[in-house]
């Protein structure tokens, strides 16, 4: 089975990208896939959310060519998810080695890369490795503008990864949130997927664990995974 590489990007802090990455990791692991979650963010948000040490030194050394062993740890046994911790040491990485070269030897069915919001070299690294790019943002102007810049960068990649915009923390009581998916689908000519606001998801992340298997957000994450499955082998125009 070919390994799927998914890049979860968000150019603005608070975009919901880390919750999306952790949620998809939990979904695929519960479905029986071997999951490798790569925290490429110097902030180490995903690493901290899972209760691991957010230094990032080992991953930074691997990307720089001075490390040899992939520094992954199993952060959950049920379902099992392997994590490559991120952290501040990644901030100094320049001219990094390709992700598929340094991580390709890890046995995984799905590799999820939680990208940094403001590090061009690391962001580009993830985009170049990805089969799928999910640009996370909230339904407001600044967040959407950041996601648009990321999606625009994928146009120069060959082959171009499959791309979708993922609106996070959607609240159907807000008129803008209800209207945004249709408006943005027309503007971007790309699929627009949604993750609804869900207290259970926020509580799980604050408690230092994987997102729950039930709830509104869990159903939305399942729909995102279904889109990824459905579009396998299809490109982005």
What are these regions (language model features)?
Residues 2-42:
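Walker A/P-loop phosphate-binding motif and the immediately C-terminal alpha-helix
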Residues 30, 34-109, 204-207:
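P-loop/Walker-type NTP enzyme "switch/lid" segment
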Residues 37-40, 112-115, 167:
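Hydrophobic residues in beta-strands of the RecA-like P-loop NTPase core, especially within AAA+ ATPase
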Residues 93-94, 117-126, 144:
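Conserved ATPase-coupling elements of RecA-like P-loop NTPase cores
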Residues 122-141:
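Inter-motif core of Ras-like GTPase G domains
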Residues 132-135, 144-163:
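Anionic-ligand binding region
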Residues 169-174, 181-210:
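Beta-strand-loop-alpha "switch" segments that mediate conformational coupling across diverse proteins
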Residues 203-225:
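C-terminal boundary of histidine-terminating zinc-finger modules
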């Amino acid at each position: 089975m070919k390994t799927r590489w998914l890049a979860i990007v968000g150019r603005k802090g608070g975009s919901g990208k880390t919750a999306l990455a952790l949620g998809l990791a939990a979904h695929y692991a519960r479905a029986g896939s071997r999951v490798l979650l790569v925290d490429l963010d110097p902030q180490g948000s995903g690493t901290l959310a899972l209760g691991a040490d957010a230094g990032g030194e080992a991953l930074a050394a691997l990307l720089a060519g001075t490390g040899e062993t992939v520094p992954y740890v199993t952060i959950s046994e049920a379902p099992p998810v392997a994590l490559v911790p991120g952290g501040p040491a990644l901030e100094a990485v320049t001219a990094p080695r390709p992700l598929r070269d340094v991580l390709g030897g890890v046995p995984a069915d799905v590799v999820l890369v939680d990208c940094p919001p403001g590090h061009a070299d690391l962001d580009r690294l993830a985009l170049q490795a990805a089969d799928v790019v999910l640009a996370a943002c909230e339904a407001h102007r600044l967040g959407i503008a950041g996601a648009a810049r990321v999606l625009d960068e994928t146009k120069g990649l060959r082959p171009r990864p499959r791309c979708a915009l993922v609106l996070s923390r959607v609240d159907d009581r807000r008129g803008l949130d209800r209207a945004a998916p249709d408006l943005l689908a027309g503007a971007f000519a790309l699929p627009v997927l949604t993750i609804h606001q869900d207290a259970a998801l926020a509580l799980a992340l604050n408690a230092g664990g994987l997102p729950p298997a039930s709830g509104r957000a869990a159903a939305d994450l399942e729909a995102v995974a279904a889109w990824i499955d459905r579009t396998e082998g299809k490109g982005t125009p």
